[in-house]
Amino acid sequence: MRDDETTVIGALVHRAVEGDAQATHDLLAHVHPLALRYCRSRLNRLPGDARHFVEDLAQEVCVAVLMALPRYKDTGRPFEAFVFAIAGHKVADLQRAAMRHPGSTAVPSDEMPERPDDSLGPEERALLSSDAAWAKKLLANLPENQRELLVLRVAVGLTAEETGQMLGMSPGAVRVAQHRALSRLRALAEQ
């Protein structure tokens, strides 16, 4: 996220909190891609078919942001941190549901597809799945704060400055923590 985008979002938030409908619409147009990227990066770690819920979950995040706007108070942190916190809670809710009731996140359908399935075949999925399982296992050995930092930096694509604002750290501390997390992952991978 660029500084000018953060400035635009900040101005939209101020107007949306005051009840400006167009600003609210424009704000949600900025929030949705952020929520989508965050949810996609977090749900890739889920077992089963929960990944099909990425778009729905991003919409839920947008609705939750919309509902929370009238009560939103600027605390000096970027509005994006507020969005990521809501998204984190929504992802955690879905993860808990998926773990409690395996298979409950499947998406059954009685309809025939309109076009052929161009997705990966069984062998390719197995290879990707084993790599994903291996990465998931490695990430599980990291503390939650290091996992979250890596998700924001690597999967969501935030800069060190933006990640620092989200997590309440300086950009230098983010870089050091990222280096330590990646070093730890490298050591775990070599075991």
UniProtKB/Swiss-Prot annotation:
One of its GO terms (molecular function) is DNA binding. Residues 160-179 bind DNA. Disruption phenotype: Deletion mutant shows a severe growth defect. Transcription of many genes, including hrdB (sigA), are down-regulated in the mutant strain. Keywords: DNA-binding, Sigma factor, Transcription, Transcription regulation. InterPro entries: RNA_pol_sigma-70-like, RNA_pol_sigma-70_dom, RNA_pol_sigma70, RNA_pol_sigma70_r2, RNA_pol_sigma70_r4, RNA_pol_sigma_r2, RNA_pol_sigma_r3/r4-like, WH-like_DNA-bd_sf. The sigma-70 factor domain-2 mediates sequence-specific interaction with the -10 element in promoter DNA, and plays an important role in melting the double-stranded DNA and the formation of the transcription bubble. The sigma-70 factor domain-2 mediates interaction with the RNA polymerase subunits RpoB and RpoC. Belongs to the sigma-70 factor family. ECF subfamily. Sigma factors are initiation factors that promote the attachment of RNA polymerase to specific initiation sites and are then released. Extracytoplasmic function (ECF) sigma factors are held in an inactive form by an anti-sigma factor until released. This alternative sigma factor governs the transcription of the principal sigma factor HrdB (SigA) throughout growth. Acts by binding to the promoter region. This is ECF RNA polymerase sigma factor ShbA. The lineage of its organism: Bacteria, Bacillati, Actinomycetota, Actinomycetes, Kitasatosporales.
